[in-house]
């Protein structure tokens, strides 16, 4: 390390130059396309569920293969180095170890991806302390590749953690791999990912203890929920657990090791009430010594090193020139520009203090540190001591000449910053918020007065801007005036912005910056230049609006429940610890005051009724003593948005138990109705079709105490919590509570030591959840919990759904309440859950929903996530006599049930009171399927007992001629078509029918056909009839269609179900290859369905399935028939 010594202070000056961006560790190409934010602002609805990743979503993910079969995951940390779990290699023989290959750039296991690279492994190093018989031994191995990978969009390394990277409990990270879709299935076809939080060691150890497992070791990391469930068991050993730094760079936090609590494991669960499954990962930050010790073996001297931990170019300076402050040395800064300075940077450190533009940033170890990189010219770096260290870190990317610093000793002084006084600037230069780029101070007021010569104007350009957002910038803001009296306001700015230049209209500009006491960001840096007045016309400047909120007020009817005027903003990706809420993002929140003092929170459910906790009002039930304030954010200020009402009547639930807090719910009737507007709106009550499940992410709001010994918060606070299983919550956290956690309670919260959960003053407030783009629904009322005194315990809420009948009976009138019924209330208010241009309506899940538009989209609740639990849905489309209906199944996933028909999607055609089953579908579809029906009525029903998801788009087409003129059912026999029996045969004729005979006795049958078309031809496969029936234990009968022959064949279609209507699945060749391998496997159960009953006797079908095929020139791809055009206007049934 460079050691600088002299008397006085040290001053370092650097000058920056433009730089280009190269491929770097920890960057996903999806970030650049989607502009993934550095700070999480979205609301998470459910995170412990596997989903398909994007193609370039995890470029550091690799597949470890033996004999071309995937067996584990891994992470690329360098061009020729991969880390994985040591246990992945335990069961392999010496011969198998020598034949391991690493595949990078892979997305699909069953087809070759564009950037896929297969590289043999030359050397394996396992951690010396790894022991396969110990749960908590260092489970890590380093693989050396025979040659380097080629980096690209789908192949990039992951960053390894630095010493100052802290992975805190509650931070949401990503796990990825080709884990099995279910316990008995094969690996997933495409790369999966799951978002899950880092778990507190103490909470993790509590769960591990209940399973008779040892506590978490120093080298292990725990992630997930105490009641994670079987989703955790589908992971991929050796794969990465990556977390994101504040600047957006991803780091490798963990390596998937094992899962505690999975069924079939060798370790019994001591307490059979515990349903936990926790992911245990090797903690990379604790294993950096092993990685760095072996990472650079074999590298040539002088070869650039990948960034691992802290490495510095070191040179000691024996003396420093002392100056009086008027002289300034010059330097050079030519380094990569990155948010957070993660890859290349130079920093200034000292043991007692560092000022960087009169700001300091304390590290956890008591030292102070600040990084500099990129091209933005920083002001002098000032250290308060006569000793300092200047570390320089660079990675392998050769993207700049580095830096040159001038070091001088100066006398201590306090330069004016414009904060607490007025700074007058008369020369071109820069100004910035105090402590920039660190967090600006609380309760700051700063003024800069820029004065140019006469006949000149001032150009103000913000090079960086991050100021806490609030509607109308009412808290933190930068205000720019065009006159010294501050009457001509040019702009009022807040949020995280990229702003164009602002030009003054005269030779004066005033910049005013203010901050409050909460949630500070890094502030701003602005450069100002002085230009001749006539140059203003050359630039044609576009002034920003006077107010620039990040989100505008949504154009939603005020009485529509659950829709806030502004989307909630979250400064952190953590789901532990509270923060100030975005003003008016929770418009149903009210404050309850008793004799003028704040007591509890509540939720608006209609203009005259408030829902709150019974314990808040039971002993103070005189309505005259209570006032209710709606539209409030800062309870210490009188805000123009407030509406104050007196209480008229208080109703406490008759079964409220003061000992157990069971039935802790109450209603307050207001003296006069609230006036709904953009900041005062009701919240939806839950609908019976959408129950609340464990691991869902919800939000709690209130003005409760920020700490156990602190006072109430002045501004509304918010916190994200996850829902726990009642049994897990009771037996893990509240086993001694009187009465336990009853069915009338919800347990929610993230167990993290030292974090605020719920405190005095939060009681009665709302627990709201939302499903994807749906409205917020009131599932709980804050009741009790030990979270304020013992932060590692979750909170407990009154379960609102249990009390719906009680609420209705007290309010006395169904018209007075709004439930989350998307079929009626929100059908036209909400966008569809997928960004499909054809989605004109989203009627939701009801006993029967009419599809009223000629085109639209309807899915299961929280599509694309699986709906968990019992669900019955039905949609009806009426088709006029001159139209056809086209249904396209965009997505189908009906898994997780041992009995096939526990989850089924059925399409019926109904004509003259007769119902005909057109299709009954199960399984999983990764492609679209199309149904055509003439109607007059088509009914789609969905039945699920366990889990499932689907999305269907539809359109009604106008038929200009007779309905059957262009679209007819294919005959099961034809004189001109070639009939193909069930055998392994090569088909080259241009068309034919493949038939499977129905056997009269129980048997297992397999049929395989291979179709080869001429060059520049395509193959169309039409399923005429394909019945599949379930046995007691499993669904039998599958049709799979592959592209190509042999080991390289690609699965492009898979069917299971009963398909009997006009179903056309076009299998079209997009490459020059022109062959399809069709493979069918049927397992028949004679006792179940070999024979079809008829009146008086049994009648056997001759054929079980019929499939027709045809080979056509490529230009004749299937088109919508010319006489089918989209229907206009409304639909009518025949």
UniProtKB/Swiss-Prot annotation:
Keywords of this entry: Calcium, Disulfide bond, Glycoprotein, Hydrolase, Metal-binding, Protease, Repeat, Secreted, Serine protease, Signal, Zymogen
Annotated ranges, domain Peptidase S1: 38-296, 575-812
GO MF annotations in UniProt: metal ion binding; serine-type endopeptidase activity
Ranges where the CUB domain occurs: 284-410, 419-531, 846-957
Binding site for Ca(2+): 116
Domain of life: Eukaryota
Catalytic machinery residues: 87, 139, 237, 615, 664, 763
Alphabetized Pfam families for the sequence: CUB, Trypsin
GO aspect biological process, one term: proteolysis
Residues of this chain annotated as glycosylated in UniProt: 52, 99, 324, 431, 507, 1106
Signal peptide: 1-22
Disulphide bonds in the chain: 72-88, 173-243, 204-222, 233-262, 341-373, 419-446, 473-494, 600-616, 698-769, 729-747, 759-788, 846-873
Assigned EC number: 3.4.21.-
Localization (cell): Secreted
Predominant place of localization: secreted
GO CC terms of this entry: extracellular region
PANTHER family in the record: ACROSIN-RELATED, OVOCHYMASE 1
Record-stated family: Belongs to the peptidase S1 family.
Name under which the protein is recorded: Ovochymase-1
Species annotation: Homo sapiens (Human)
Lineage, top ranks: Eukaryota, Metazoa, Chordata, Craniata, Vertebrata
Name of encoding gene: OVCH1
